[in-house]
Amino acid sequence: MTPELRHMLRDDDLNHEEQKQVLELAIKFHHDRFYKQPFAGPQAVAVLFDKPSTRTRSSFSIGVAELGGYPLVIDKSGSQLGRGEPVADTARVLNRMAYGVVWRTFGQGRVEEMAKYSTHPVVNALTDDFHPCQILADFQTIAEHRGGVDNLKNQTIAYLGDAANNMANSYLLGGAVAGMDVRVAGPYGYLPRPDIVADAKRVAAETGGSILVTTDAKEAVKDADCVFTDTWVSMGEEAEYAIRSKPFWDYQVNTELMALAKPDALFQHCLPAYRGKEVTAEVIDGPQSVVWDEAENRLHAQKALLTWLTGKARGDESLLA
């Protein structure tokens, strides 16, 4: 197998078969947390944070350690990136020390520049535009509740709320890669960028999926297999909550809206959740909610992704399955 440097910067960086490989590997890690250990020595993976995190920080820190590596966790305040050092310079330094870079930051262009200058895999752990690691965990959760990865193609998923945010973008692209029927609903002024919708439709045409963007929450949820939402206010916008939340009340996931989905529909939320706002307590704490499985699967999905990317970079086929 020829070594091939690959990155995970947005959800369509994996094709349909590659996404299946990663998800199958994630399920294996769920059954055996030490299924594979691609890092030895231990070899370091740089885990950089420009934004606060609970799930991303804990899952990548624990995950890299369980893969046999050393998670070099650096916050913005502890990095020269936080003082304006060029991304390219940071990448060149980390090339000499680390075996991969995981970065939770703001602009998508920052992780893309890191990848441009990196000689090791770079993983987008969240940007303003995309959250691909979360989507892998979400799809792993669906697969585990629906009889396997092959059944993802049969799923209809609905995302409600701020449809212009990173989660909506990633559901569009990641769902298209999986061959799902993806529905995204939000109010006018909070819909996905046309270029992302166009990319999702192009991929869906290749995989047999479909894309629907609408302002009608009921249309999106009708007969859906899984319903997703996210906080209405992203990090850094908390002071604007009263103003920003006004357009979203019709998209609150409650028992009435869930009743329009299939009777066995799942509910997922990437967390943190605000009960009584984007979702009611009856739903997130109810029998259809799988949010804690979803949160745990961040660990397994990210370990699978790092293992797969490392296998590609080393030309080691044994790490791909």
Curated annotation (Swiss-Prot):
GO terms for biological process: arginine biosynthetic process via ornithine; citrulline biosynthetic process; L-arginine biosynthetic process. It comes from the Bacteria. L-ornithine binds at residues 166, 230, 234-235. Pathway: Amino-acid biosynthesis; L-arginine biosynthesis; L-arginine from L-ornithine and carbamoyl phosphate: step 1/3. It catalyses: carbamoyl phosphate + L-ornithine = L-citrulline + phosphate + H(+). The keyword Magnesium does not apply. Its EC number is 2.1.3.3. The keyword Amino-acid biosynthesis applies. Belongs to the aspartate/ornithine carbamoyltransferase superfamily. OTCase family. PANTHER family: ORNITHINE CARBAMOYLTRANSFERASE, MITOCHONDRIAL (PTHR45753), ORNITHINE TRANSCARBAMYLASE, MITOCHONDRIAL (PTHR45753:SF3). This is Ornithine carbamoyltransferase. It comes from Bifidobacterium longum (strain NCC 2705).
